């Protein structure tokens, strides 16, 4: 929103400038050689968003003006924090004063393209271009070259073509400029002085082909990257093509007035843009800080920025624990010797305020052994910081999917992580003072302490859920592969969305495979586990690293298969069929608690369920809820083909 406000403000200045100043300039530019034949604006780059971009542009334009006092061609490049390269070329038949006048008009029109990162303007007497890269030796461009034809027609179908060819040949032979006239038709060809003879020839050959399209028209113009070609039924160039050195007094006065007005307008433009930018930035910062102050005012959990800065060795790279979409986490050692995790937020927008409030307001008042504890925050420094308890073993995904550590977690430890995560979610859904939906349960958001006990982290996407509501309607946010289908399709959010994510997590832990890892023979993890379940070979889905342990510990393999069934129950297509987290805990801990037969998960068509992993049999399995859901969800296996989890936020 802030960037949009800046852009709109800048455009208002341009509009004001165009309506109130350009009429005066137009009155001094009746000479047809200052007629604008083409203005082309490029896209925007990161450089054009730099606050130094406009001042650099103004300085470039001023430097070009000074160079044109002695010649008709000039380039300028300012290599500062934002680099801008500019080129001006007057046609060789123009006198110095005519050249200055043409440039003055071009200089007042080209700001219409700002803050675009590139622009070209063709006048009938000169050419002006700026870019964020050095382009001086460019001759042609399929994307940018253009031509224009007049509306008036003549009888001769080859009118202007032959004389244009002649002018182009003369220009190549005589160093880049040539004119020609025959049978009442006149033409002018001009290459930029930065081009060599061969590049000039290539550019003008293309220009001749372009004006050839203006068959039976009184005038035609080709406006290419490195040259300009024009023909007309009247003589528009000066004399025989050689420039004039005498300067008429009234034209000199006009040039002085136009240049002075141009410089004055550019200064007003720059000053207005800078002021509006600063005012907008200040208002947004005050608004954000005001919201934070009103929402978070507990002095016991406030940290001084300087304290956290020193605790992390000034955010040293050696202290970095991890990096996510909304910030970087560092290890900090407080003055009392306590280790903490300091999250350095990178946002300063409305989304940042919302996620900051979620982190602070939702979990600062709740405590559970399986939830990462928020110790406090700092909002008074140049950036906002959150302080958490330090969890030494980092995240679960590093243990499961790092080949060097995959054997560290045995089945007993994995079961403990599954159960602890379930208890943490059950507390959020019904045991805490408010009902909370996490929305982003995944292996990278489950941290492990020194005893490998799980702690759910990252509450930036969490939502508070009223006791009187059956669901929330909200924008989609979460990680692809973990999001529940009804949430993806309809935006309806309930606790069952977390249950679905937990089910995916269970399958990943038990199988040691990422949800988005695709195997051509068996499909994705969810599909593979389901197919093996229908074949009564669920044990084959378990992590091969656990094979030796299952052989040594009697009953552990059956227990693991039971856990996989619970995972399938949690990932059923219909949210009403999924168990609550309290029921999940009872299924995992009580020997005699009934475990229903799961129905097929979403994103799997019934035809895909007939696949035999060995190709020796055909399975037919009916479902009671999937058929209806599959008519609504048209997503196939491509839903899970990304190589790594990607977070979607469309709030």
Swiss-Prot record:
It catalyses: L-seryl-[protein] + ATP = O-phospho-L-seryl-[protein] + ADP + H(+); L-threonyl-[protein] + ATP = O-phospho-L-threonyl-[protein] + ADP + H(+). Glycans are attached at residues 79, 151. The keyword Transmembrane helix applies. SMART domains: S_TKc. The modification Phosphoserine is found at residues 444, 473. Residues 1-28 form the signal peptide. Disulfide bonds: none annotated. Its EC number is 2.7.11.-. Residues 29-251 are extracellular. The modification Phosphotyrosine is found at residues 388, 487. ATP binds at residues 321-329, 343. It is a single-pass membrane protein. InterPro entries: CR_Ser/Thr_kinase, GNK2, GNK2_sf, Kinase-like_dom_sf, Prot_kinase_dom, Protein_kinase_ATP_BS, Ser/Thr_kinase_AS. It comes from the Eukaryota. Gene3D superfamilies: Gnk2 domain, C-X8-C-X2-C motif (3.30.430.20), Phosphorylase Kinase, domain 1 (3.30.200.20), Transferase(Phosphotransferase) domain 1 (1.10.510.10). Keywords: ATP-binding, Glycoprotein, Kinase, Membrane, Nucleotide-binding, Phosphoprotein, Receptor, Repeat, Serine/threonine-protein kinase, Signal, Transferase, Transmembrane, Transmembrane helix. One of its GO terms (molecular function) is ATP binding. Residues 315-604 form the Protein kinase domain. The active site is at 440 (proton acceptor). GO terms for cellular component: membrane. The modification Phosphothreonine is found at residues 474, 479. Pfam families: Pkinase, Stress-antifung. PANTHER family: CYSTEINE-RICH RECEPTOR-LIKE PROTEIN KINASE 3. Belongs to the protein kinase superfamily. Ser/Thr protein kinase family. CRK subfamily. This is Cysteine-rich receptor-like protein kinase 42.
């Amino acid at each position: 929103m802030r960037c949009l406000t800046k852009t709109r403000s800048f455009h208002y200045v341009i509009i004001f400038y165009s309506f109130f100043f350009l009429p005066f300039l137009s009155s001094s530019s009746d000479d047809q050689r200052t007629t604008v034949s083409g203005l082309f604006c490029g896209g925007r780059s990161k450089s054009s968003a730099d606050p130094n971009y406009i001042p650099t542009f103004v300085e470039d334009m001023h430097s070009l003006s000074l160079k044109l006092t002695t010649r008709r061609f000039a380039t300028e490049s300012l290599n500062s924090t934002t680099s801008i390269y500019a080129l001006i070329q007057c046609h060789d038949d123009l006198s110095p004063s005519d050249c200055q006048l043409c440039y003055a008009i071009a200089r007042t029109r080209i700001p219409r393209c700002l803050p675009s990162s590139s622009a070209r303007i063709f006048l009938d007497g000169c050419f002006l271009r700026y870019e964020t890269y050095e382009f001086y030796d460019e001759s042609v461009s399929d994307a940018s070259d253009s031509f224009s034809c007049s509306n008036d027609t003549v009888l001769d179908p080859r009118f202007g073509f032959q004389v244009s060819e002649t002018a182009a040949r003369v220009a190549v032979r005589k160093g880049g400029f040539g004119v020609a006239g025959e049978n009442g038709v006149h033409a002018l060809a001009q290459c930029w002085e930065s081009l060599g003879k061969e590049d000039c020839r290539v550019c003008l050959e293309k220009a001749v082909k372009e004006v050839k399209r203006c068959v039976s028209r009184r005038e035609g113009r080709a406006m290419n990257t490195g040259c300009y070609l024009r023909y007309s039924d009247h003589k528009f160039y000066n004399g025989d093509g050689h420039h004039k050195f005498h300067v008429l007094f009234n034209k000199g006065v006009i040039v002085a007035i136009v240049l002075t007005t141009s410089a004055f307008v550019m200064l007003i433009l720059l000053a207005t843009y800078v002021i509006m930018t600063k005012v907008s930035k200040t208002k947004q910062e005050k608004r954000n800080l005001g919201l934070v102050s009103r929402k978070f005012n507990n002095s016991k959990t406030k940290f001084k920025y300087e304290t956290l800065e020193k605790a992390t060795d000034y955010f040293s790279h050696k202290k970095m624990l991890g990096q996510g979409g909304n910030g970087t986490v560092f290890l900090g050692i407080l003055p009392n010797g306590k280790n903490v995790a300091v999250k350095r937020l990178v946002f300063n927008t409305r989304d940042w305020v919302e996620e900051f409030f979620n982190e602070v307001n939702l979990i600062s008042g709740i405590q559970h052994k399986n939830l990462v504890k928020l110790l406090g925050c700092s909002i008074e420094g140049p950036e906002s910081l959150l302080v958490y308890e330090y969890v030494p073993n980092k995240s679960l995904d590093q243990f499961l999917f790092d080949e060097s550590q995959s054997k560290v977690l045995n089945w007993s430890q994995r079961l403990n992580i599954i159960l602890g995560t379930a208890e943490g979610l059950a507390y959020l859904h019904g045991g805490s003072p408010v009902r909370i939906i996490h929305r982003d349960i995944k292996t990278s958001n489950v941290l492990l302490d020194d005893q490998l006990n799980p702690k759910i982290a990252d509450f930036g996407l969490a939502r508070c859920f009223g006791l009187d509501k059956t669901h929330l309607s909200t924008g989609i946010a979460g990680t692809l592969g973990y999001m529940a289908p009804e949430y993806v399709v309809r935006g309806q959010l309930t606790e069952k969305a977390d249950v679905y994510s937990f089910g995916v997590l269970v399958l990943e832990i038990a199988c040691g495979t990422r949800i988005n890892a695709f195997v051509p023979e068996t499909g994705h993890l969810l599909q593979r586990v389901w197919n093996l379940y229908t074949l009564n070979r669920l044990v084959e889905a378990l992590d091969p690293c656990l094979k030796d342990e299952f052989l040594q510990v009697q009953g552990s393999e059956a227990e693991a298969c039971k856990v996989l069934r619970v995972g399938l129950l949690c990932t059923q297509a219909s949210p009403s069929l999924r168990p609550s987290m309290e029921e999940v805990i009872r299924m995992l801990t009580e020997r005699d608690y009934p475990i229903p037969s799961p129905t097929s998960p979403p994103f799997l068509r019934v035809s895909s369920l007939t696949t035999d992993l060995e190709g020796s049999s055909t399975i037919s399995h009916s479902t009671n809820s999937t058929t209806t859901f599959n008519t609504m969800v048209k997503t196939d296996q491509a839903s899970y083909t990304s190589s790594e989890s990607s977070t979607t936020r469309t709030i």
